Regions:
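Intrinsically disordered, low-complexity regulatory regions in eukaryotic proteins
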Residues: 1-82, 86-142
Length: 142
């Protein structure tokens, strides 16, 4: 096997490995985005369920299986992150609108990442085929 053949095979193998790592990273990012999207959908559903005249004795989840009982006044607002860790109280309709927009943006990002994943996967398959063909031709020469 010539030095050029070895170098080319090593380059292809490295590229395949880099692509595999990138695909794994994209999968992890998409999974995290999906968790965020589901959390936002649940929040939208919860906010939408608050009646305009408020609610008495509503159970508000704090996390870790803990809830607090509270009264929700009529025409209440929700405190929402508006960016750069700045939070502001917004009317429920506006908070729902903001969350809906964020959910749509996450879906767009997830779709772009899935397209990128498919492109990398296609390239990786092509490189793997070239690698296998070169290995087969080298073995045939011996």
């Amino acid at each position: 096997m010539s030095a050029v053949d070895k170098a080319e095979l090593q380059r292809i193998a490295q590229q395949v490995e880099l692509n595999r790592q990138r695909m794994e990273s994209i999968e992890q990012q998409v999974a995290r985005l999906e968790q965020i999207r589901l959390e936002q959908l649940q929040t939208i559903e919860t906010l939408s369920a608050i009646p305009p005249n408020g609610a008495k004795g509503a159970m508000i989840p704090l996390g870790s299986g803990v809830q607090i009982v509270a009264d929700i006044p009529p025409k209440t607002g929700a405190v929402i992150d508006i960016g750069s860790r700045v939070q502001a109280e917004k009317p429920l309709d506006e908070a729902i609108e903001i969350l809906t927009k964020r959910t749509e943006e996450i879906l767009e990002l997830m779709n772009k990442m899935k397209i990128e994943f498919s492109s990398i996967e296609e390239t990786t398959i092509s490189l793997a085929n070239v690698f296998n063909e070169q290995i087969a031709s080298l073995q045939a020469e011996q």
